[in-house]
């Protein structure tokens, strides 16, 4: 579980989602009892969603992982298919329970696009062979789920349908694009030593992947300001971009700085 779903890191990402949503769409004062309740529920929904995605990916990518990553938990028998299925069912139940708790019945309807997109993702948009040959298209399609996810968060928190709210949805989406590129930035290698073409640095090249991280950070910060966040978020984003550029030769530095930029920008949006 820890190997494929590191709970501390995933929990930090879930907290970042909740903080960002409250910063851009919330109406209650930060630190109030209702604010904390919403924070916990939003984080819980996102955590459960990520767990459901993890379970889906283990099933969806089983053949690929068995070929190039034979020591992963499912491949080496450390976890059974039955246990994986039970985890997925539990994650879905927790996710839907959190959605209803934070947004009620109407919110469940608003969350439906997230469920539909994630279900289509599980079958690779019914175009597995096509997407296997088009890495960037696959990336874009998979990241689309953040648009309805942040749209649901805005609805759940009572944000009006304005240009500022739409800017907030885009800001959140781009910030979590950073998280995704960072997650699969470092090159991976098959048992025979060959580089596996399933990471962003391997397919796009390190420079292009870093450019995507930096531009997404800056665009997210600017959109957050358009959504009502303070200008301090642009300062924080610029600082991370400069640091990433300065340490761009180190995979570890890019991953650590890129990963830390997500909760840092989310927190800065509260100001």
What are the roles of these predicted feature ranges?
Residues 128-131, 231-271:
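Extended hydrophobic alpha-helices typical of membrane-associated regions
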Residues 1-58, 132-133, 142-145, 153:
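Topogenic membrane-insertion module of multi-pass membrane proteins
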Residues 11-19, 75-78, 137-155, 199-208, ...:
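Small-residue-rich segments of transmembrane alpha-helices in multi-pass membrane proteins
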Residues 18-42, 94-109, 148-170, 221-230, ...:
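Helix-coil boundary and interhelical linker segments in multi-pass alpha-helical membrane proteins
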Residues 90-98, 215-223, 239-244, 261-265:
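Hydrophobic, membrane-inserted alpha-helices
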Residues 54-93, 173-223:
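Solvent-exposed interhelical
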Residues 47-58, 116-127, 148-152, 170-189, ...:
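Transmembrane alpha-helical segments that form the membrane-embedded catalytic/substrate-channel core
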Residues 83-158:
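Intramembrane alpha-helical segments
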């Amino acid at each position: 579980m820890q190997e494929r779903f590191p709970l501390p890191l995933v929990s930090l990402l879930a907290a970042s989602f909740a903080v960002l949503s409250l910063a851009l769409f919330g109406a209650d004062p930060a630190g109030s009892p209702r604010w904390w309740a919403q924070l916990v529920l939003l984080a819980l929904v996102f955590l459960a969603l990520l767990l459901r995605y993890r379970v889906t990916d283990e099933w969806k990518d089983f053949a690929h992982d068995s070929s190039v990553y034979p020591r992963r938990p499912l491949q080496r028998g450390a976890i059974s298919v039955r246990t994986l299925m039970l985890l997925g069912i539990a994650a879905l139940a927790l996710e839907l329970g959190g959605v209803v708790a934070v947004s009620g019945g109407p919110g469940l309807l608003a969350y439906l696009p997230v469920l539909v997109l994630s279900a289509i993702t599980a079958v690779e948009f019914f175009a597995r062979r096509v997407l296997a040959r088009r890495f960037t298209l696959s990336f874009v399609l998979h990241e689309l789920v953040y648009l309805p996810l942040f749209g649901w968060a805005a609805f759940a928190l009572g944000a009006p349908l304005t240009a500022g709210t739409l800017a907030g949805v885009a800001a959140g989406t781009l910030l979590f694009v950073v998280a995704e590129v960072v997650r699969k930035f470092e090159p991976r290698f098959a048992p025979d030593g060959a580089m596996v073409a399933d990471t962003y640095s391997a397919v796009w090249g390190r420079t292009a992947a870093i450019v995507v991280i930096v531009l997404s950070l800056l665009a997210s910060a600017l959109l957050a300001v358009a959504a009502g966040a303070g200008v301090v978020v642009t300062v924080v984003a610029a600082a991370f971009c400069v640091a990433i550029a300065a340490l761009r030769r180190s995979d570890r530095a890019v991953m650590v700085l890129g990963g830390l930029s997500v909760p840092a920008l989310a927190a800065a949006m509260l100001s």
